[in-house]
Amino acid sequence: MRMYVETHMRFGELFKVDPEEAIDNLDRTFEMKLEAFHTLYDVSKGLFPYFGNGDTTVLLAVRNAIHHRNHPLFHSLNRRLYLDTDLDRWCGASFLLASHPTLHGIPIQMSHYVRLDDLDARLDPSCASPYLDTIVGSDKAVRRMEGIDMQLKLPAIRDRGLRDRYPKDQIYLDLMPIFVSAVCKVFKAMKAAGVAFRGFDAETYAVPFTSEIEVDLSSPSLKRLQVGGLGPPVIVDV
């Protein structure tokens, strides 16, 4: 977490002089967060039902997908807008950005947006995607997707995108609140089991993640990112 925070703090200034390095650094450190979460899973899966919770299930699935890199999925929104294409290519386009708010009202200041239809392509058997995760059987995959949809309220995001006529590939989901929610749940389970948090980083994050932060997965918040002809893209509430 600390490395991602530090990279995020440097992002704005570095982006002004080297957008590619700034975006690469941020994306790679987010992948490091996912790898660290997988390590957390390895050592604590006996203490917490990872696959019974939508947030932890999504993180492990996205981590595995990015780790194996046998598909073109899960490029960040920053990468798509500024590196995969020129920003001018999107002049006049709108993107629907979905995120999960906190219950204490103070928003999470960092974000990592990926296409929602990438998540569907990887996890939803009904999409019949060539990039579908085939590690689990079809019946289990259906139940997994149903649990994710129910707990993260993804159908509400898809419905809003359809109603407002957003192309499917312009609907994005913020993984950062999902990550925070997942870590909070696991840390609380570990604390309840009497696991000691040792080391500077562990001690620093133990308190906020076990007693201060809580994410509301039941009510996704929606914003619109509008790409204009002048200046940077603008984000507004919808």
Residue positions per predicted region:
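Long, hydrophobic/aromatic-enriched structural stretches that serve as scaffold segments
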Residues: D18-F48
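Acidic, Ser/Thr/Gly/Pro-rich intrinsically disordered interaction regions
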Residues: M1-D27, Y50-V238
